[in-house]
Amino acid sequence: MESQQLSQHSPISHGSACASVTSKEVQTTQDPLDISASKTEECEKVSTQANSQQPTTPLSSAVPENHHHASPQAAQVPLPQNGPYPQQRMMNTQQANISGWPVYGHPSLMPYPPYQMSPMYAPPGAQSQFTQYPQYVGTHLNTPSPESGNSFPDSSSAKSNMTSTNQHVRPPPILTSPNDFLNWVKIYIKFLQNSNLGDIIPTATRKAVRQMTDDELTFLCHTFQLFAPSQFLPPWVKDILSVDYTDIMKILSKSINKMQSDTQEVNDITTLATLHYNGSTPADAFEAEVTNILDRLNNNGIPINNKVACQFIMRGLSGEYKFLRYARHRCIHMTVADLFSDIHSMYEEQQESKRNKSTHRRSPSDEKKDSRTYTNTTKPKSITRNSQKPNNSQSRTARAHNVSTFNNSPGPDNDLIRGSTTEPIQLKNTHDLHLGQELTESTVNHTNHSDDKLPGHLLLDSGASRTLIRSAHHIHSASSNPDINVVDAQKRNIPINAIGDLQFHFQDNTKTSIKVLHTPNIAYDLLSLNELAAVDITACFTKNVLERSDGTVLAPIVKYGDFYWVSKKYLLPSNISVPTINNVHTSESTRKYPYPFIHRMLAHANAQTIRYSLKNNTITYFNESDVDWSSAIDYQCPDCLIGKSTKHRHIKGSRLKYQNSYEPFQYLHTDIFGPVHNLPKSAPSYFISFTDETTKFRWVYPLHDRREDSILDVFTTILAFIKNQFQASVLVIQMDRGSEYTNRTLHKFLEKNGITPCYTTTADSRAHGVAERLNRTLLDDCRTQLQCSGLPNHLWFSAIEFSTIVRNSLASPKSKKSARQHAGLAGLDISTLLPFGQPVIVNDHNPNSKIHPRGIPGYALHPSRNSYGYIIYLPSLKKTVDTTNYVILQGKESRLDQFNYDALTFDEDLNRLTASYHSFIASNEIQQSNDLNIESDHDFQSDIELHPEQLRNVLSKAVSPTDSTPPSTHTEDSKRVSKTNIRAPREVDPNISESNILPSKKRSSTPQISDIESTGSGGMHRLDVPLLAPMSQSNTHESSHASKSKDFRHSDSYSDNETNHTNVPISSTGGTNNKTVPQTSEQETEKRIIHRSPSIDTSSSESNSLHHVVPIKTSDTCPKENTEESIIADLPLPDLPPEPPTELSDSFKELPPINSRQTNSSLGGIGDSNAYTTINSKKRSLEDNETEIKVSRDTWNTKNMRSLEPPRSKKRIHLIAAVKAVKSIKPIRTTLRYDEAITYNKDIKEKEKYIEAYHKEVNQLLKMKTWDTDKYYDRKEIDPKRVINSMFIFNRKRDGTHKARFVARGDIQHPDTYDSGMQSNTVHHYALMTSLSLALDNNYYITQLDISSAYLYADIKEELYIRPPPHLGMNDKLIRLKKSLYGLKQSGANWYETIKSYLIKQCGMEEVRGWSCVFENSQVTICLFVDDMVLFSKNLNSNKRIIDKLKMQYDTKIINLGESDEEIQYDILGLEIKYQRGKYMKLGMENSLTEKIPKLNVPLNPKGRKLSAPGQPGLYIDQQELELEEDDYKMKVHEMQKLIGLASYVGYKFRFDLLYYINTLAQHILFPSKQVLDMTYELIQFIWNTRDKQLIWHKSKPVKPTNKLVVISDASYGNQPYYKSQIGNIYLLNGKVIGGKSTKASLTCTSTTEAEIHAISESVPLLNNLSYLIQELDKKPITKGLLTDSKSTISIIISNNEEKFRNRFFGTKAMRLRDEVSGNHLHVCYIETKKNIADVMTKPLPIKTFKLLTNKWIH
């Protein structure tokens, strides 16, 4: 480094040693405005660093360290005594007024002496303001006075820096605008440079060349104030001056930074694009340069990703480095670090090759001549710490233990180097220690110290003013190309590649950082004691340690050779992986692979694994010796630290100190468990536990929720309890970081009570082990107690409380005492404790009647907290009581599901006592449990509901046990108890295995069959399907409780005098077992047909022949015979072959008539006069009288493992109440939420399609100007009623496209925000079917259209606001709606009014009265369904004209123009239609069903024999009360909704033959018994098997140009609950079935005729409405017909005799029918029952009959 000699005018005071080696920042002439922006961030600290590190002496002044002090004391700044500045001066009032700055009010505010004006600066009129310099002052301004203690520069330097006194400095202009401040600063800096003050301005190194004096600072302040008036300063300048009005340097630094930041980005990008590297400069410097540019761009908001950065770097590689372009060209995941690693490897290899060549050229003797000393050409100067020792040192290197630096950098005081015992050093030159240079550049002399190098250590150098290091591995925050010139003792430049920080981690676990320079051209790594002293670290060579001023030892010092060293192990490595470049020659001729390179290449494996693999030759091409393992031990891979980061292990025993520090009940642990799902509202869902640290005493409290007030109540209770009961105050409560503990309410409560909350650390649950383990123990006890007792799940907290009582009384193995003993309480009296769930009899002290029993069976739970009684659960009353009036049942089973309490009491009065509590669940609770809570996209924190498939999988973990007992005979014991509540045993059936738990592909084909012998003797059994039928068995056994049904009476023979209603015999459910299902012949089957006895109101004419049509002539019209025949002529009625009369055998004639009044819900129309009634027999015809059932599904036990869990709360569901509670079929959600479609969607392809649809929807919303984008509203300013939540829904359309829709949450819309009177209309399905039928008959063209985003075309009138879509990131703002967003209550009505107005006014259409969304004119008919349009016209051009007009206003898409004469396929509102104009039309849903049914998770049977009918006749739905666990009940109801919802959609579209089965099962959605679910599965299986069936229409060929509209009616009398009949109607237009209806009668019918009248009366209004629609669409005459198979009904309709009206209800209906028949010209005709196709709408039919009635119109 450059030598600095002491001036002759500067005496050596204070015994300061001279500097032997220093570094000097050479002053440059570079304009400070041209420095890089990245190099100016420290410019702000220039003024704070001025003199901050320089010792203050009486001979040298310094700026106070706290320069931000508002009023520094003048006494702290000594004034010069004999210098050229004799007096202190402040700005006067006149000067202040001119500059605009306020006058200093106190001398202490301006303590610095005024900087007198230089004679070179003579502005006009300024002579009176500033005192001139004395004439004898001939040095420049930075030259201090001799008394200042500083040295004058030599004459040469003074001469070069002086400016002639004859020249005038041009003053800067006065600032006139804040916008011109930066330009003014440029001129002001030039002014300072011309005034010889340029060296105090920060340069490119971010530091000034020298420190300013007090006088210079005063001059700076005065000139700045004079030429920059305060009113024109920018705000940021005023902010700086408000803190310290003298900090002008900070203002100049920031100004320079701001000026350079404008052009720095362009320069960086240009530099990055024009990179060039060929190995001529060190790779470290190249990497530092590029890294610096990338970091700077990233900080300025211009991020450059790895791929682009690597392309820039590779483009600039040349020479030997060029091949890296090709080697890395195809690398996909390439990073800048990897690329620079390869560059470093190549550079190191080049340097190694050069050093090897140099070694061969030089002899070993020459190498020994390398020395750290050079020839002394100046007079040696002795610098000693001990003057008593002679100067006997020889010419050698300066030792690092007794020299210090003396330069502009701050140096240590003499006391920093303590007690050296070495001899004084004789330096032959001013600087005797060099920093090293490249050995190839020059030859140096060497002393006799040849072995003075210690690897892995830093050389301590007291003469070096800077720390230098050869490896960039330890440099932090490196920046390249520093403007620093460093020279050695021979004044040779040492190139510096980078500057950064060197970070130490010493023994006292402290970290320290100093500045470091990087250069590979030195022989040793030098550590400057001067820079260590600046951070309060000194070297004590008596102790050989580095220590702080307070004596703290930081690191040992090692003396090796003649030098002192410090180990590099205290250095912290940086994240720059750069190979160390050393210029010391190596004796190795081969290059080793660095371990970091091998570590990264071998997937970041550890060193031990890599070495073991190389030893065993599992990796070839190189050996273990080819790797440099020196850095493997202490190597830290940052990527491994990040990628393999793990949690620390919990420290065991960390809580032991608390046990000794706190008294009992002062330190508590608490935690919350929950929630427990599927519990009644009265049962708690959570519990909170407390544990005392010292005594381990536990408390538990129930919680229904985790709200703040609930938690606060518990804390208040527990604190009061401890304070009053134990006279203790809680000091600390340890808890986790749940929101229930970290909320502000609880925090304030604890703070108010002086309690310290102690929270667990993140991801360290074991730190909360006391509370966590307690909860786990209590839950284990809870599950065990519930399993042992068999009690329902809603009593779970009682089990928790029982366990807590016991656990507090058990001794701990460690303390040998129980928690109660530690707390000073007495032991638990076990005589007062009962086993949990112990059966007891509780005294009923308040019975309803004196004759009622006084004892109620119950179960003991736990001792009462509030009394001396016991808490007992009473199942019959469904409540718990606190009582002492109980008796323990000795020797009885303790399991709820094994103990028969009804058998114990033997008194039916108890059942009557508790009967009122067995009511069916309220309809509002059912509705609430079945609602699907769909949250908006903005409420992602809320719970996400399970997908139906996931829910089914979750619930499929439980299996109910199987009653595998063989059928038993009916004994007297089985008759004795008729109302016993039978519960399935809780034990796991041994027959259950994996094969019968998992869903089976086949169901058992053998149902439960009644006893054959008893059946043959006249006894009849009702089919009771067992709760579980193992799927591995071929036969199912009769349930053990089948004989206990209250409706069953066993008898050996049938009595003619029997008056009780008897159940209709049940046909078997099919099978192949010859022992249970004997084969029958057709002759025997025919004998089973029994004619029902005539009703009292049945006309005798019904016994007439059934093979001809009887025309009925009304009073108003007397059509001819051919009119009635023409009505029936074209109908798709079955063709019946003639049948000879069959006489019944004597045995059949002796059978009594079957009572038709059934109280059971049935799928068979047994009570109807037109039904086929069958009885059990040994032989039957499978084809005629029953439906084939090939699979016996166990509806909930096939996938349930619930029997392995504790018993749960159960619901008792009554059939009648469940049927009455069903109002409508709840639609099943078919759409996906945002999280389901995108966030958690694992199907990548589908996810991408949904994302594309999402962006498409957003663009459409913006295009349609759905909301006001000009203003966003604060949520707090808007009425919450007008704020509508929004969400995105996604679905996949039938054509395979994915669609997203932004919708409003209309389900939670406030009623005040819409008009409830507005209606959203869509086309009626009958209107669509009618239009299609007329189109076929008239050869119409059918065109299908779609209007995109239809609702958004309708304006919204109300003031509504929504939250913006999620992608806008504005969750706290609101936007006002301008258009009718999908989902709003009024959107549909708004769109309907908009499109209706347009079609009428612009397209010339008229809406058909009474039929909304049906528009017509003379040429075109339009059916509108929201945004879908179907156009019908004779001429295709008419459709095109309508389309052109629609496109003028709406975004109209043509789905199918329909211009082809061949078969055209449509998808209209879910119907798959095949249409060939003028020939036929086929309507089906095969593709849709193929896609949807498998998603229902119904176990289909694709390989077995297909079902031939959707149901089986004569099968009753059991009325017995259904008892289910609550979660099972909800799951089954939800499953029924899905299945019936799909079946209903299909049935009302075109499968009218299934409507009876769908309607009947829909009534039992809330009664999901095993039998009902089996029937539902059968229906879905039948739909699957017949999914290819279609509704077939052929073009009619009428004789006359008329339309014929016919309704066929039928009723099944009394086959529904409450004697309700089933009615059905089928509507036909020109012989084509266009609709059907099957429903339960709204009134109770007392006869078949009443049922038929009711059915006809329900069909006539729709018949008249359809007639009007047909006449409007097709201007032709119309003939209307009404067909029924009830002659008595026809006679009542056409008769004028009112005596037939037996009651007012049906009399009114009959009279209305008479009027309608006569007034509307209805032709009422009779049709044979066997040809009545409406028969399929009212009852289940045998296979043969079902096929016969449906195969002509659906196949």
Curated annotation (Swiss-Prot):
Query: What are the residue boundaries of the RNase H Ty1/copia-type domain, all occurrences included?
Result: 1610-1752
Keywords, comma-separated and alphabetical: Aspartyl protease, ATP-binding, Cytoplasm, DNA integration, DNA recombination, DNA-binding, DNA-directed DNA polymerase, Endonuclease, Hydrolase, Magnesium, Metal-binding, Multifunctional enzyme, Nuclease, Nucleotide-binding, Nucleotidyltransferase, Nucleus, Protease, RNA-binding, RNA-directed DNA polymerase, Transferase, Transposable element, Transposition, Viral release from host cell, Virion maturation, Zinc, Zinc-finger
Q: Where is the composition biased (Low complexity)?
A: 960-969
Q: Where is this region: Disordered?
A: 1-88, 137-174, 350-420, 958-1172
Residues reported in the UniProt entry to bind Mg(2+) 1: D671, D736
Q: Where does Mg(2+) 2 bind?
A: D1346, D1427, D1428
Domain Integrase catalytic, by residue range, is 660-835
Q: A GO term (biological process) for this protein? A: transposition
| Region called Integrase-type zinc finger-like, residue ranges | 583-640
Remaining remarks: Retrotransposons are mobile genetic entities that are able to replicate via an RNA intermediate and a reverse transcription step. In contrast to retroviruses, retrotransposons are non-infectious, lack an envelope and remain intracellular. Ty1 retrotransposons belong to the copia elements (pseudoviridae).
Q: How does it assemble?
A: The capsid protein forms a homotrimer, from which the VLPs are assembled. The protease is a homodimer, whose active site consists of two apposed aspartic acid residues.
What name is this protein filed under?
Transposon Ty1-MR1 Gag-Pol polyprotein
At the highest ranks, the source species' classification is: Eukaryota, Fungi, Dikarya, Ascomycota, Saccharomycotina
Q: What is the name of the gene encoding this protein?
A: TY1B-MR1
